[in-house]
Amino acid sequence: MQDVVENNILRFWLDKMQDHERGGFYGRMTGEGEICPEAEKGCILNARILWSFSAAYRVLHHSEYLAAATRAKDYILTHFIDPEYGGAYWSLDCDGHPLDTKKQFYAIGFVIYGLSEYARSTGDKEAFERAMDLYYCIEEHSLDKQYGGYIEAATRDWQPIADMRLSDFDANYPKSQNTHLHIIEPYTNLFRLMQERPELTTPKAVSYTHLRAHET
């Protein structure tokens, strides 16, 4: 299994998908193995790359995995994070400029997951702090304080949005099991990170009491 992960999956991303011209990773490859350099770059894809190489480095300690994780982390923080309103854009063009600026909380959860795993692997304080910033974005703008749970999406400046779907194949409902699962996942990793690396926590950090409340 480790051989498949390292020499098939991770090696593929290292050898074929790093965008050395524009930064980060390519957004698409055809079924025939042809890179599409002009393809948009999605938040979820990049956050998953960040988590994957961060976790690989934490377990296997290979320097090239750390380099790939750092590449993904730096690209996300530089290009996907909205410097004006906070949160993360849904997608960028191939040059790293915002393309779809809506705030999909499913995607923001993935960025938290990736950043928190990078902080677990490296002890990087900035990654932890930026993960916490995104946590507070979700708590402020997605948490339904009246009925509970989390809404799906908002506009760039956190206003209500008519189309909350992740894709054309999804139902346009204000809440979904899918998004809730992918909020539990990063919140759990934040909790794990704070237990493993207490030196990173600050007075602003999420309280354990609040995280435990989500268990019920």
Model-derived segments and their meaning:
Residues 37-52, 102-113, 126, 174-185:
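Aromatic- and histidine-enriched alpha-helix N-cap/loop-to-helix transition segments
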Residues 61, 81-82, 123, 139-144, ...:
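Helix-capping and short linker residues that terminate individual alpha-solenoid repeat units
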Residues 199-208:
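Histidine/acidic residue-rich metal-binding segments in metalloenzymes
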